[in-house]
Design a protein with these regions (language model features):
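Short, acidic Ser/Thr/Gly-rich low-complexity loop/linker segments typical of extracellular
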Residues: 36, 63-82
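Short, ordered, surface-exposed loop/turn motifs in non-cytosolic proteins
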Residues: 40-42, 48-64, 68, 88, ...
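Short Pro-Gly-centered beta-turn/loop motif in secreted/extracellular proteins
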Residues: 51-53, 82-90, 98
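A short, solvent-exposed loop/turn motif at the edges and junctions
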Residues: 62-68, 90-111
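The canonical Cys-X-X-Cys-His
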Residues: 175-186
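Structural signature of eukaryotic scaffold interfaces centered on beta-propeller domains
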Residues: 269-290, 342-362, 393-400, 454-473, ...
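Conserved beta-propeller blade signature
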Residues: 293-297, 364-368, 402-406, 475-479, ...
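Blade-level signature of beta-propeller repeat domains, shared across WD40, Kelch, NHL, RCC1
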Residues: 538-539, 630-687
Length: 687
């Protein structure tokens, strides 16, 4: 045999061996080792042309139950998955993941092994259709820092009152605009529909029209005022660049503990309903209402409460009685420009605007409304109006069973139960800022909007958007909207109010932050946690303040050392320097009793623009995403322990789809809100 012949034989042999390896690899992929499942599970392996697909979602959905039911899990490092504990039904099962397009839906029932074939996205644009809204919103290019202060109508169209780029960004987030009501970056919001482009070849004109469309058209139009109509060009350019093919960066796939998350959704309410918040339990004792109903309030869209039974997989609605028929509507009743979904129909007809529910130690749900409070008792099946209860926006229970409200008022539940006198059980704390620094409240103080007199205290009003009582010292903390905004501490005993602003253009801080919305507390340490819409999750430790907490120098920016800013996940706006994210955060929450499985007092942040809730665990983010349907926007959240002896199955985090425009979600105008539970398994294959 010649050398050339031997080389040919060796080459052919090598190719044959390589072909055998490739063939066996494909055979192994097709005949993957079954995963361990029970009779109520579905399990298998997800592969694509690239091999096993790690960190992608497997969705199981059914409409066979009393309400639509969806359970989602994540594959492990070898592409394996287990969808656990499914109620008996026929399920559509498919794969969704970043870098993929949806696989075909496969019909199956629990107890079956089901290997799934994932589809690699044919183009980057096809893959990007599945990205969260905030990744698309991050393509927006805000005005450059040199555009500020604004120069008004005759200049750049931005009001002179907007002094910095941060103020402009804050106003397109949670400062009474845009992302306070819905996600920005969804397909509905980022693209200009073809018919609108035909009607308005100029994209600025198209955007001017679209912010006047539908039931919220008047509100959107007026909300543009603080940033000026000249700001429309930045949104128009955003849409034009996307239409021209610009794409966002790809989000990371779930890693680590993110792969252990099980997400369960139950459909409730109606396709025209705005569910603002829900509640599962008394957060002070999260075993209250174990396996019981999850209660949601339908704000603005109607005077209803939605109730989910997660055991029977059913939901119902309870109508609230309007006691004063002369009460005006909670939302405008005009449609400036017809909706592409609902036409001229006024789809929201509510008067009471139920806003926020909280459960007490007996499992009763207290609900704030425009005319005070409603009290829902799930066990008795009763709903009653509580005369004298202050009501309003948000509420929180202190350990002594006083309810504190965002208005700064309170309601003594124990006194009310003993006397039945609601008016006598309500109260408020008159307060001042201790400007003269003598440690006591000196009334009357100087006017809050007048010049500072260092010898006299300054008038103040307790209250804010969100609030939390401190169980360690009895103080009440509030978040106050604005740029930079603030958090305030009310001591009901001394009647003194302290004001702390996040560091903003402060030479003692390397970073600037602004616009608090939610607020909560570490129950063990008293450290405050605040979601800042500069794109940060911030902790504030009053014990770290080095200077005086009161006195003439304590004007807000006096304790930058008390703040720790954690940049939130996700990209920042294009061309914006510094840390932060284009995501928005309606509220945040601290898990006092390990209901989520990450440990006591784990701080959590609601990613209102990113289809997620997030846990900050040992300084690292765990992002819990709802991949289907796209457009999951939460506002508040809580956690419940149904069975402390049942491990991960006996506990979970709860929230609800709270997109004001439900029809912006994947599924369009037929899509209904959903109650959502997150559970943390020990592994992606735990059953």
């Amino acid at each position: 045999m010649t050398r050339g012949t031997r080389r040919l034989v060796l080459t052919c042999g090598t190719l044959a061996a390589l072909f055998l390896v490739i063939s066996m690899t494909g055979l192994n992929a097709r005949q993957a080792t079954p995963v361990s499942i029970d009779a109520d599970d579905i399990g298998g392996v997800v592969t694509s042309t690239k091999g096993p697909e790690a960190g992608v979602w497997v969705v199981a959905e059914t409409r066979d139950l009393p309400t639509r039911f969806i359970r989602t899990v994540v594959t492990d490092s070898r592409g394996r998955y287990v969808v656990p504990d499914l109620p008996p039904a026929s399920y559509d099962v498919w794969v969704r993941g970043y870098g993929l397009v949806d696989s075909p839906k496969v019909k199956t029932t629990p107890g079956k092994q089901l290997n799934l074939k994932a589809l690699v996205a044919p183009t980057p644009a096809a893959a990007a259709e599945y990205y969260p809204a905030n990744y698309w919103y991050a393509l927006l290019e805000p005005p450059a820092p040199t555009e500020f202060p604004g120069t008004g109508r005759k200049g750049n169209g931005i009001p002179e009152s907007i002094k910095t780029q941060g103020e402009w960004i804050g106003n397109i987030k949670m400062n009474l605009a845009c992302t306070q009501c819905h996600q920005m970056g969804t397909k509905v919001t980022r693209e200009i529909p073809p018919d609108l482009r035909t009607k308005f070849p100029n994209s600025v004109d198209a955007w001017d029209e679209r912010i006047q469309i539908g039931i919220s058209g008047a509100f959107m139009n007026s909300s543009l005022g603080p940033i000026g109509r000249g700001s429309l060009k930045y949104f128009a350019r955003w849409s034009d660049r996307i239409a021209g093919g610009e794409l966002p960066v790809a989000p990371p796939r779930p890693e680590g503990q993110e792969r252990n998350i099980v997400v369960t959704q139950w459909e409730w309410a109606t396709a025209k309903t705005f569910v603002h918040d829900g509640i599962a339990t008394d957060r002070r004792n999260p075993t209250v209402n174990a396996y019981g109903p999850y209660v949601g309030v339908e704000e603005l869209s109607g005077d209803w409460v939605s109730v989910l039974d997660p055991v029977k997989h059913s939901s119902k609605r309870i109508e609230l009685e309007v006691l004063d028929n002369k009460m005006p509507w909670a939302w405008q009743q005009d449609v400036p420009v017809p909706s592409r979904y609902w036409g001229d129909e006024v789809i929201w007809k509510g008067k009471l605007a139920p806003h926020n529910p909280m459960a007490d130690s007996k499992g009763r749900v207290w609900i704030t409304t425009r005319d005070g409070c409603r009290l829902y008792d799930p066990k008795a099946g009763t709903m009653r109006h509580i005369a004298g209860c202050p009501g309003g926006g948000h509420l929180q229970f202190a350990d002594d069973d006083k309810i504190w409200f965002g208005s700064g008022k309170y309601f003594d539940v124990k006194k009310w139960e003993a006397t039945g006198d609601g008016k006598a059980s309500a109260g408020a704390v008159e307060t001042v800022v201790d400007t003269n620094g003598n440690g006591k409240a000196d009334f009357p103080g100087t006017p809050a909007d007048g010049p500072v007199d260092p010898t006299r205290d300054r008038q103040a009003k307790a209250g804010g958007y969100a609030l939390i009582p401190n169980p360690l010292d009895g103080s009440i903390w509030y978040s106050v909207l604005g740029i930079p905004g603030s958090i305030t501490r009310l001591d009901p005993k001394t009647q003194l109010l302290e004001v702390y602003e996040p560091p903003f253009n402060n030479p003692k801080s390397k970073q600037s932050a602004y616009l608090p919305h939610g607020i909560d507390i570490d129950r063990a340490t008293g450290v405050i946690w605040v979601g800042l819409n500069s794109g940060h999750y911030a902790s504030f430790d009053r014990r770290k303040c080095q200077g005086p907490l009161n006195g003439p120098t304590a004007t807000g920016q006096h304790c930058p050392e008390g703040w720790t800013l954690h940049p939130a996940p996700g990209p920042n706006f294009k061309t914006v320097e510094g840390t932060g994210s284009a995501d928005s955060y309606y509220l945040n929450w601290v898990d006092w009793h390990n209901t989520g499985g990450f440990g006591n007092n784990t701080p959590m942040l609601v990613g209102s623009g990113s289809d997620s809730i997030m846990a900050l665990v040992a300084g690292k983010w765990v992002v819990m995403r709802v991949p289907y349907p796209r457009g999951f926007m939460a506002r508040g959240m809580d956690g419940r322990i149904d069975d402390p002896k049942a491990g991960w199955k006996g506990r979970g985090l709860w929230t609800t789809h709270s997109e004001q425009a439900t029809w912006h979600q994947e599924g369009g105008p037929t899509e209904r809100p959903k109650a959502v539970q997150f559970q943390l398994r020990p592994t992606p294959l735990a059953k």
